[in-house]
């Protein structure tokens, strides 16, 4: 299957099971922060097996960046991507995505669901427009937090972490529930950005609407 061929310039692990890829950028390639792309590995037998990944770099950058959660138990594309290194190639297919910035609000990310928000925050930070935005980032444990130092530097006190399986002193150690939302959100008449596992997103949609948020204010991947 056809696609734009890009070469891997650098790889590194940012957590135990999350790998960062820096890629060449095709001339004229465009995306909006928060959008992603269907990606396949440029190898015989792998080119037709596409998976969706989100770009985390600034659109103006000279290279592309993907941050990928590796699922070895799935024995699929991410397991193969774990073995890729500098000089290997990927194919970029259709650009897509409905998670784009609409205005200040709350961002709720679960695990690797942080990736579309990274590009958005980086762009807002560059433009000096991060004020009024809060990130609530849920992970199983402290070791699963992706790009923690950068997020802390950009958002400071507006970066809130929750952990579902590991109690960490000074941080919430439970799943995000209605009580959490009532404590954190004083105004439900604003934008709410949601990204993570389907159950995580679905539960937040339901709870936010029940607490007074307009369905039209919820931004998520349909």
PLM regions: where:
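Absolute protein N-terminus
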Residues: 1-2, 222
């Amino acid at each position: 299957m056809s696609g734009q061929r890009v070469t891997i310039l650098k790889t590194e692990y940012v957590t135990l099971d999350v790998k960062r890829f820096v890629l060449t950028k095709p001339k004229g390639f465009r995306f909006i922060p928060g959008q992603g792309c269907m990606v396949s590995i440029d190898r015989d037998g792998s080119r037709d097996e596409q998976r969706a990944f989100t770009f985390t770099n600034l659109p103006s950058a000279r290279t592309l960046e993907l941050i990928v959660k590796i699922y070895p138990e799935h024995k699929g594309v991410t397991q193969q991507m774990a073995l890729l290194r500098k000089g290997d190639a990927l194919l970029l297919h259709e650009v897509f995505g409905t998670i784009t910035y609409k205005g200040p609000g709350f961002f709720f990310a679960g695990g690797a669901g942080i990736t579309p928000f990274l590009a958005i925050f980086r762009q807002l930070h560059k433009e000096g427009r991060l004020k009024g935005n809060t990130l609530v980032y849920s992970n199983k444990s402290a070791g699963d937090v992706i790009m923690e130092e950068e997020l802390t530097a950009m958002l400071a006190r507006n970066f809130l972490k929750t952990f579902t399986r590991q109690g960490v002193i000074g941080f919430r150690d439970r799943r995000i529930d209605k009580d959490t939302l009532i404590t954190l959100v004083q105004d439900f008449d604003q934008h709410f950005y949601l990204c993570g596992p389907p159950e995580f997103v679905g539960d937040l949609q339901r709870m936010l609407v029940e607490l007074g948020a307009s369905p039209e204010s919820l931004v998520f991947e349909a």
